[in-house]
């Protein structure tokens, strides 16, 4: 018997179909590479920005200072957020440097574990927001890992400035039972860290006068916003 050649319409001949496929794949690859080059060449336009919250033992990340500060960070383009959580139940920390140091060591180990998978070099801008003993944890973590970040320290402890936090701004109340305001202020000056002091405010930057405390919170957040908006050093 004689074989008859199968006639394909030009658009669907096997060879033509293969050519179309190659052209489409090539076009997709070229487009993808172009997008990657565009994003790579515009890192200043589309920077990777990360904010990390280091809470205190009893002051979690949804309490006012950390809640509103990270909201401000999100408005400033920090679209990657990490919220740390601690587990610590021992009492008797206040007034006991040894107990406080033990708590710090425990919380620092927990922070190390929670941040172990972070690829720090991929971020163009890193901001640490911290509260109370979390200010010492954040300062130690940045120092030990050489992370070029900025830090906002809410109600820091004396221990915090022994860890030399860099590129930082601090807030403290003069009636804070966890910190001696004068010694912390001196340590902040020696470290080159601006410290905003609030008269008669406690460890939560509150006085008991609700309207006054709301005004204080607004002032703290305005200063926080200004610091966040500054170009990273």
Place the predicted regions along the sequence by residue:
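A conserved short beta-strand
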Residues: 147-156
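Serine-hydrolase catalytic machinery in alpha/beta-hydrolase-like enzymes
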Residues: 48-122
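Catalytic histidine-centered segment of alpha/beta-hydrolase-like enzymes
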Residues: 201-215
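Short beta-strand/loop motif that positions the catalytic acidic residue
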Residues: 170-172, 176
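Conserved alpha/beta-hydrolase "acid-adjacent" motif
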Residues: 177-183
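Gly/Ala-rich beta-loop-alpha elbow adjacent to hydrolase catalytic centers
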Residues: 129-138
């Amino acid at each position: 018997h004689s074989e008859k050649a199968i006639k394909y319409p030009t658009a669907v001949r096997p060879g033509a179909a293969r050519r179309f496929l190659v052209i489409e794949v090539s076009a997709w690859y070229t487009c993808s590479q172009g997008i990657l080059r565009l994003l790579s060449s515009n890192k200043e336009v589309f920077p990777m920005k990360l904010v990390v919250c280091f809470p205190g033992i009893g002051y979690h990340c949804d309490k006012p200072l950390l809640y509103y500060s990270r909201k401000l960070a999100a408005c400033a383009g920090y679209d990657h957020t990490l919220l740390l959580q601690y587990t610590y139940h021992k009492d008797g920390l206040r007034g006991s440097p040894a107990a406080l140091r033990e708590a710090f060591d425990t919380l620092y180990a927990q922070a190390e574990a929670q941040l172990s998978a972070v690829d720090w070099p991929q971020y163009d801008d890193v901001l640490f927001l911290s509260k109370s003993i979390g200010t010492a944890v954040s300062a130690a973590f940045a120092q030990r890992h050489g992370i070029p970040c900025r830090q906002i320290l809410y109600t820091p402890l004396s221990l915090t400035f022994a860890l030399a936090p860099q590129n930082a701004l601090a807030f403290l109340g003069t009636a804070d039972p966890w910190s001696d305001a004068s010694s912390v202020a001196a340590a902040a000056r020696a470290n080159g860290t601006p410290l905003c002091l609030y008269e008669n405010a406690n460890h939560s930057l509150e006085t008991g006068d609700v309207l006054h405390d709301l005004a204080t919170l607004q002032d703290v957040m305005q200063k926080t916003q200004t610091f966040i908006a500054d170009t990273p050093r």
